[in-house]
Amino acid sequence: MPAKHVAAEDDVRAVSDQFYSALEAMANGDASSMSNIWSHEDDVTTMHPIGGREQGWDAVRGAWEGVASASTDGTVTRTDQVIRVIGNGAYELCTESASMTLAGEPVSLEGRATNVYRKEKGEWKVVHHHADYHDEFAEIVANMGA
C-alpha cells in the first residue's frame, strides 16, 4: 500500500479516535465535542441505535444533545475497525460497545457501525454515522420524549 494511502488512513483513524472520545463524552452528558469533528453541512446524516434518521448538522447535533442530556456513567468502545480511503472520502466499519445510565436506566449495547468521513478544507470530518438499531435503547429514549 502506498505511503500516502497509509497516511490518509492514519489521519482518518485519528478523527475516528476523536469521534469515539466524543461519543463517550456524550454518554456522560456532554455532546459539545461533536461540533469539532462533524461537518456542519446540510448533507450530514446519522442513524442511531434509537432509530430514525437525522439529516443536516442542526438535526444531527440535536440528536446527540438529546441523548447527552439524559446520559451518565457511560463508556463507548469500538473493535474490529476497518478504514478505507477513496480520494476525499473514507469509510469505517467497526463494532461498537456502549454502556451508560440513560434516563435513570442502565443500558448496554453492542452492534455494528459504519462511519463516513469527508475531507473539507484539508481536514477530515464525520459526515455520517450509522449504528445498529437497539430495542431497549430506543424504548428508553421514546419514553423520555427525545
Segment roles from a protein language model:
Residues 9-17, 25, 31-87:
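A solvent-exposed, acidic/Ser-Thr-rich amphipathic alpha-helical stretch
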Residues 64, 78-84, 95-98, 112-118, ...:
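Hydrophobic/aromatic beta-strand elements that line small-molecule binding cavities or substrate pockets
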Residues 71-73, 99-108:
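Short, cysteine-centered beta-strand-loop-beta hairpins and adjacent loop/turn segments enriched
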Residues 83-91, 105, 117-125:
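A short, structured loop/turn motif at beta-sheet edges
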Residues 103-105, 136-142:
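A short, polar/proline- and glycine-enriched secondary-structure boundary/capping micro-motif
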Residues 110-139:
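Short beta-strand edge/turn micro-motifs at domain boundaries
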